[in-house]
């Protein structure tokens, strides 16, 4: 196996026994809504009671999904690790329409290049991502997220799991208190 000089920081917050896995696509409006609730969930349920694991679910109908997802993973290799990745997710969420296509097929992003998208994310997040994005074997981490989703039958975002089991009754539209109740139920 090839030795690498980089490490993608796992996108994990909290250290409790109940595990809440969330598969998100960074430009999906429903994923953005779910992402915006994760800090509040950790605060309400308690980092000693739950663990949140963020998984990335790139989806081809979100046309620049692969580029944006790779930017998130690239950010996780920087000094700030998962917090840098979270900053990229927050920047994309705050400006979601600037990373998406009109009706998944048109609009201003038709003329955008991957470098334009990276520069846009850098501008909004305040992070320099170019070198990390260009790590030759960074796709290994991208593929890990993809394989994890596939082996678990994840097809849409967001998808929520509690202790490894898909929970289709949980929605991005739910209140944080409802998520906490699901997680903390005996």
Annotate each predicted stretch with a short phrase:
Residues 2-18:
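A short beta-strand-turn-helix
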Residues 14, 74, 132:
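Functionally engaged cysteine thiol sites
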Residues 21-26, 32-118:
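Structural alpha/beta surface segment adjacent to cysteine/selenocysteine redox centers
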Residues 17, 68-69, 126:
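Residue-level signal for cytosolic alpha-helical hairpin/rod architecture
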């Amino acid at each position: 196996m090839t030795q690498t000089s980089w490490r993608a920081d796992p996108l994990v917050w909290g250290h409790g026994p109940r595990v809440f896995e969330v598969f998100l696509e960074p430009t999906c409006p429903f994923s953005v809504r779910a992402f915006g609730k994760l800090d509040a969930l950790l605060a309400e349920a308690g980092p000693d009671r739950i663990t949140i694991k963020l998984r990335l679910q790139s989806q081809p109908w979100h046309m620049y999904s692969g580029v944006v997802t790779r930017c998130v993973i690239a950010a996780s290799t920087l000094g700030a690790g998962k917090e840098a990745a979270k900053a990229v997710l927050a920047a994309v969420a705050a400006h979601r329409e600037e990373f998406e296509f009109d009706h998944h097929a048109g609009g201003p992003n038709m003329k955008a290049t991957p470098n334009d998208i990276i520069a846009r994310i850098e501008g909004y997040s305040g992070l320099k991502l170019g070198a990390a994005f260009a790590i030759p074997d960074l796709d290994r981490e991208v593929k890990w997220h993809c394989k994890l989703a596939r082996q678990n039958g994840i097809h849409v975002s967001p998808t929520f799991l509690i202790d490894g089991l898909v929970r289709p009754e949980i929605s991005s539209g739910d209140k944080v208190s409802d998520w906490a109740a699901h997680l903390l139920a005996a």
